[in-house]
């Protein structure tokens, strides 16, 4: 999140805490303002032309044949013992990079070691030119996060939610100014840290 968006941290939490699922829309209440979020609204603010899909896929609910993923992702693909997920490290370097981008931007996940078969199909469709209703997908993630009131491991799409709040005229109060970010590590500090780590390895050996 940028420095400006960091000021919205508490408002984003309020968004998820107060939202209710009403069919194919989220009824939201933040700072006394009520508004609705739908896939169509997301397409409007993100300037996305949605594909004409009668029933957009809900990737979390899908069960896949292993052969499909082996053919598209990797012949060396490793599945978990129960067959419900794949080992990310068994993907090619290019797909691992795409997976990390996917995890951080489109399909939040608390661990990047394994991904379930639904996320694997999402990855497969990205590299196979299969149409994805990304707005329906984002709405599904928002909806799922709202429903999981007691088990929110991560809060997804913080920047998107803060943008929605801005468009609705909802801003943080003056006493919620963001904390200053720490300065980045300079090259001298980085080299010193690497040298210190090498000394520790030698002493252990």
Go through the PLM ranges and name each one.
Residues 1-202:
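A structural signal for long, well-ordered, hydrophobic/aromatic- and basic-residue-enriched core segments
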């Amino acid at each position: 999140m940028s420095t400006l968006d960091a000021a919205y941290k508490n408002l984003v939490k309020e968004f998820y805490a107060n939202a209710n699922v009403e069919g194919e829309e989220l009824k939201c209440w933040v700072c006394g303002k009520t508004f609705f979020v739908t896939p169509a609204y997301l397409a409007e603010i993100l300037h996305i032309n949605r594909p004409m899909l009668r029933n957009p896929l809900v990737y979390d609910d899908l069960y896949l044949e292993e052969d499909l993923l082996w053919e598209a992702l990797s012949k060396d693909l490793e599945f978990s013992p129960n067959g419900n997920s794949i080992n990310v490290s068994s993907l090619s370097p290019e797909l691992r990079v795409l997976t990390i981008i996917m995890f951080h931007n489109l399909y939040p996940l608390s661990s990047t070691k394994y991904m379930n078969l639904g996320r694997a199909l999402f990855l497969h469709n990205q590299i196979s030119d299969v149409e994805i209703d990304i707005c329906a997908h984002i709405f599904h993630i928002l909806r799922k996060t709202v429903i999981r009131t007691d088990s929110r491991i991560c809060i997804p799409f913080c920047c998107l939610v803060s943008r929605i709040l801005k468009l609705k005229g909802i801003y943080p109060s003056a006493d919620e100014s963001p904390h200053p970010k720490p300065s980045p590590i300079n090259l001298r500090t980085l080299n010193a840290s690497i040298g210190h780590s090498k000394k520790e390895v030698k002493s252990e050996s």
